[in-house]
């Protein structure tokens, strides 16, 4: 299998430690519901530290290693992966800190009215008065709900932090890369 486009690789988590003696790795997922990671058949690992959000560099491409996933399961809020070719604890420990990436095309189809946060990044955000608030720069979790960071995507300057709840996010139009929000431009 060839390396997917660098723009298409999405970071899903990082290996935090070895799990057991048989070469399993414990992954700290970035998502509270790591459905894509749990269903993956192939993952890519990068041992380089995380840069800013966005495309991987060509240097990073040269360090990517592909692994077939033999099994994946949840355990105490982490994902435990069994990777082909990693058969003992020492091999698993050598991967500690590696970032787990998955080809976006390998994600399972999102359920109706559900979205992968990565697909929201880069969307324009407008309010009900048709004022453009900016671009979606990031989406994070605060424990209660998602939070959308909106601002200038080219400089990563955040102007608004908006709760990702149905009372605020009125419409998500992924084909047109547009979110409609019940949010005033003077709310900071």
UniProtKB/Swiss-Prot annotation:
Q: Which GO terms describe its cellular component?
A: cytoplasm; ribosome
Q: Does rRNA processing appear among the keywords? A: yes
- State the Pfam families in the record: PRC_RimM, RimM
One GO MF term on file is: ribosome binding
Which key words tag this protein in UniProt? Chaperone, Cytoplasm, Ribosome biogenesis, rRNA processing
Highest rank taxon of the organism: Bacteria
Query: Which ranges carry the PRC barrel domain?
Result: 112-187
Which InterPro entries does the UniProt entry name for this protein?
A: PRC_barrel-like_sf, PRC_RimM, RimM, RimM_N, RimM_N_sf, Transl_B-barrel_sf
- Location of this chain's protein in the cell: Cytoplasm
Q: For this UniProt entry, which residues form the secretion signal?
A: none
Biological-process GO terms, alphabetical: ribosomal small subunit biogenesis; rRNA processing
Question: Does Cytoplasm show up as a keyword for this record?
Answer: yes
Note the subunit structure: Binds ribosomal protein uS19.
Q: Which NCBIfam families match?
A: 16S_RimM (TIGR02273)
What function does the entry list? An accessory protein needed during the final step in the assembly of 30S ribosomal subunit, possibly for assembly of the head region. Essential for efficient processing of 16S rRNA. May be needed both before and after RbfA during the maturation of 16S rRNA. It has affinity for free ribosomal 30S subunits but not for 70S ribosomes.
> Domain text from the record?
The PRC barrel domain binds ribosomal protein uS19.
Similarity-based family = Belongs to the RimM family.
Q: What is this protein called?
A: Ribosome maturation factor RimM
């Amino acid at each position: 299998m060839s390396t997917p486009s660098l723009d298409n690789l999405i970071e899903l988590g990082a290996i935090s430690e070895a799990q057991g003696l048989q070469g399993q790795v414990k992954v700290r997922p970035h998502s509270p519901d790591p459905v894509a990671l749990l269903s993956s058949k192939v993952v890519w690992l990068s041992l380089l530290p995380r840069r800013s959000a966005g495309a991987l560099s060509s240097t990073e491409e040269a360090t990517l290693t592909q692994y077939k996933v033999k099994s994946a399961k949840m355990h105490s809020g982490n994902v435990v992966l069994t990777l082909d070719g990693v058969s003992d604890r020492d091999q698993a420990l050598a991967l500690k800190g590696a970032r787990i990436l998955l080809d976006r095309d390998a994600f399972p189809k999102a359920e109706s009215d559900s979205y992968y946060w990565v697909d929201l990044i880069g969307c324009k955000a407008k309010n009900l008065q048709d004022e453009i608030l900016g671009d979606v720069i990031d989406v994070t979790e605060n424990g209660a709900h998602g939070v959308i960071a909106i601002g200038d995507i080219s400089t990563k300057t955040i102007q608004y932090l908006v709760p990702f709840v149905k009372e605020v996010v009125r419409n998500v139009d992924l084909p047109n890369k547009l979110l409609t929000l019940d949010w005033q431009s003077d709310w900071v």
